[in-house]
Amino acid sequence: MKEYRVYLERARSRQQDFLYPLIFREYIYGLAYSHNFNRSIFVENGSYDNKYSLLNVKRLITRMSQQNHLIISANDSNKNPFLGYNKNFYSQIISEGFAIVVEIPFFLQLSSSLEEAEIIKSYKNVRSIHSIFPFLEDKFTYLNYVSDIRIPYPIHLEILVQILRYWVKDVPFFHLLRLFLYDFYNRNCFIPTKKSISTFSKSNPRLFLFLYNFYVCEYESIFLFLRNKSSHLRLKSFSVFFERIFFYAKREHLVEVFSKDFSYTLPFFKDPNIHYVRYQGKCILASKNVPFLMNKWKHYFIHLWQCFFDVWSQPRTININQLSEHSFQLLGYFSNVRLNRSVVRSQMLQNTFLIEIVSKKLDIIVPIIPLIRSLAKAKFCNVLGHPISKPVWADSSDFDIIERFLRICRNLSHYYNGSSKKKSLYRIKYILRLSCIKTLACKHKSTVRAFLKRSGSEELLEEFFTEEEEILSLIFPRDSFTLHRFHRNRIWYLDILFSNDLVNDE
């Protein structure tokens, strides 16, 4: 990475196109191969001894540059006519090369900003997706309203390329990227749809994740700009300028957005108690003030997506609810603010009176129904939550079968230890435990009772419930750690970088 840094600094100092030449460097594709989501796309059964060739990649790029992307052919084939090889195969290789090259300048920029902020040591904890929940526990108990927002897609591919061009000045590289994207959509759908986006994300995962995250980052940067500047804008001059290159200039070309709605309310628009969190395609906006301001932000989001990103967004994709009456779903948890009421008897001189105290607490619980649905989809139980055997694992040894189930239980327990109530988590463990026993009994062609009586595996299967407690007893001092505290308290692990496979936020 140091070599990339030196190369980029030299190229930028000469004001050259510094990304385009990297596309034709063979070591870039070797780097993509070593860091790829699925290495099998770089192996093709052919006459090249299962090795990719840079010459073939260049030939495919030449072919794409000679195509007319305004003409859609119904007979377009996935076969390259002059090579006879699978066109999708080479497209995936080029996609990985694009992803590696375009990630380099942003990775260097991120690393340098982290070094300047001196937060490298704590960066690993900040990266954890569960670091969101301590923030929610600290802030959301003082808030009243929450807005669930689902970020709309698909976005037109031309908008994606333009957004990237605002940040990196390399005309040949983005021209080639545009050719690649148009070539993909010409073979699937000229206008991006959810189906074509899903196809692109599966065949080109790394490039898709980068483009999608950059699209979200761009909309959030505009949102944060307006959030910070909204209270300083005057009544008659409030407007939104949807041009990233000259963000603070050309006031005569500012595009006024819902100025009618703001004509009498802008002086009260400042809201210091508004908080925003996001994970993947879902974000949450919470505020302490009246829902009127939340509706203003709702209309702002809709206009932003429609005017700047040309993405159609309907108002029903943004829901505003009271925190005390509504549970919002995030990262596989259901969260809501619970009101705890208590009565205190107070005495002043000879007068005695009762005082009602209302305290708020953020409840974060395990959603049992979606988890059972995920377990049923994975064939661990039926739709009612009754455990069933896993016949496809019956060919493995007893130790491997038990280890597989234990690994799933360990991961779920690790992920859901922040729950306020552990009862749902214990039910999931119980389902997996019985599914493991039934799988072993099915393998040995016996009943569950006969298998347990003959093999004495009951003590071994107790690890489903005791292993997590033993680990925590090693982390915390024994005088402070008790079984009662384990069942009652929430424990957030800050080493979780992605959601569990069984977590479903839909």
UniProtKB/Swiss-Prot annotation:
Signal peptide: none annotated. It holds the Pfam family MatK_N. One of its GO terms (cellular component) is chloroplast. The keyword rRNA-binding does not apply. It comes from the Eukaryota. InterPro entries: Domain_X, Maturase_MatK, Maturase_MatK_N. Keywords: Chloroplast, mRNA processing, Plastid, RNA-binding, tRNA processing. GO terms for molecular function: RNA binding. Its main location: plastid. GO terms for biological process: mRNA processing; RNA splicing; tRNA processing. Coiled coil: none annotated. It is found in: Plastid, Chloroplast. Belongs to the intron maturase 2 family. MatK subfamily. Usually encoded in the trnK tRNA gene intron. Probably assists in splicing its own and other chloroplast group II introns. HAMAP family: MatK (MF_01390). This is Maturase K. It comes from Trifolium hybridum (Alsike clover).
